[in-house]
């Protein structure tokens, strides 16, 4: 296990490993633990009471964070004709079809989100082995395969994120930067928690939110009382 640096050990003293904090307290404490020389990302980790091995207990979805992520996301759109024009007008960074497929097959991956119109998926499907493992493949469930291209682009630019439970039943999601005001982080946190509740599988039994923690990129985890994580 790697040893943590002096700075990490110092800020860790501020955090009780036993205590379950109120969301407001956790966010205030989190801002005190962020002392790196760059603007650290704030991430939430939620352990869910689901068994991801079962198809009917998969948890995935999207949420538009009201205050954005603090990161400028580069959006690529696979579209032609009027839909390509719509994408450009909505603020997409890259728009194209066969030309973009060839570029990506050549190793170019300088974008954060890919969106496609349904008619383009036959073409985009060739990129499955490249985009799939990186979580970049357009997907109807994530709202990234759609005819409403303008809305999809604008939502991503505004702070839409995708969440998906991993094989250990944990969801990791960014909710902003350490430089955000505490109130804005709280609003983003609440939006994510509400979205997780909406995505609860009907077959999930027992306690759904088993544990919740917050951390900055370089900071210690701060445990949040899961019973208080949702209003």
Swiss-Prot record:
Biological process (GO), any one: regulation of translation
Database matches in PROSITE patterns: RIBOSOMAL_L1
SUPFAM superfamilies: Ribosomal protein L1
HAMAP family per UniProt: Ribosomal_uL1_B (MF_01318_B)
Assembly behavior: Part of the 50S ribosomal subunit.
Protein family: Belongs to the universal ribosomal protein uL1 family.
Protein name, UniProt field: Large ribosomal subunit protein uL1
Gene source species: Moorella thermoacetica (strain ATCC 39073 / JCM 9320)
Higher taxonomy: Bacteria, Bacillati, Bacillota, Clostridia, Moorellales
